[in-house]
Amino acid sequence: QAGVALAHQRLSILDLSPLGHQPMRSADSRYVLAYNGEIYNFAQLRAALAALGHRFRGHSDTEVLLAAVVEWGLDDTLARCNGMFALALWDERDHCLSLARDRVGKKPLYYGWAGDTLVFGSELKALWQHPDFDNGVDRHALTLLLRLGYIPAPACIHERTFKLMPGRVLRLDAQAVAAGAAAHRPDQAQQPFWNAREAMQRALAAPFTGTDAQAEEQLDSVLRDAVALRMVADVPVGVFLSGGTDSSIVTAMMQAQSDQPVHTFSIGFEGSHHDEAPLAREVATHLHTDHTELYVSGADALAVVPTLPDMFDEPFACCLLYTSPSPRDQRGS
């Protein structure tokens, strides 16, 4: 009746049962949510909502997110969320669609026009499926790509198409969009729920005054908490290990908090001085992880080139091509 449709293809991480399926309707039937990502602190939010009288059928973070919107509203909910997400929330009562993207934009959110229809998705491939989406290449976006190696938000490789800015909410009234009131620039209606500059200014106003030892202790605590939150899943969890400082620390913290060997994955390059696989192997051996290596040749890399448009949606200067097939093959075996 409102001319709005939500669809979702789920990558199941939490609550693999049908109770976690999306799009999901809130308990009061006012809201319908489809989102890509994960709310890492959903357990804490769930406990707070349960104390306020909310009841849950399953244990997915999607259900918690919906209950939070019912209790606190979307803006306050997003301010409380620790996670990565691109979401679409339909308000059945007010006939308003809200699109939101996480603070630093880990998850993309594309939206634009297919003829006179507003379309959106966390991948450009979703927009391409609309029969009226035939938007050509945006020349300004192409210029940004050649200069920066990627296309920053709000620009998009397609004309009349945009990426939602990180930390923003876009609210669209269904009647206004249907009447063309958005004038093909709905991005002008974006509102920030988080601002990096303001966060930096707050940090500068209250600088850390402890000792070096206290700083190390606090950093260790923050990192361990961050890793623990990301390990919550109803499916096996793995980690990409290069042998460098960052991935080695994350792997060590994962293994310290796991009662089973952590699945680690690394890639190597035959006959190359860039090969870090031996370093990763040493770390994996030291930590007693379940380690998998994938060696890549020049021919392997060339064979991937035809699949790049499907991988990236937009043109993107990135060489991390073989980090995903290895865990996928491991899961299949």
Feature-to-residue mapping (PLM):
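Cysteine-centered catalytic environments shared across enzyme families
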Residues: Q1-F312
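Short, intrinsically disordered, charge-balanced linker/junction segments flanking boundaries
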Residues: E314-S324
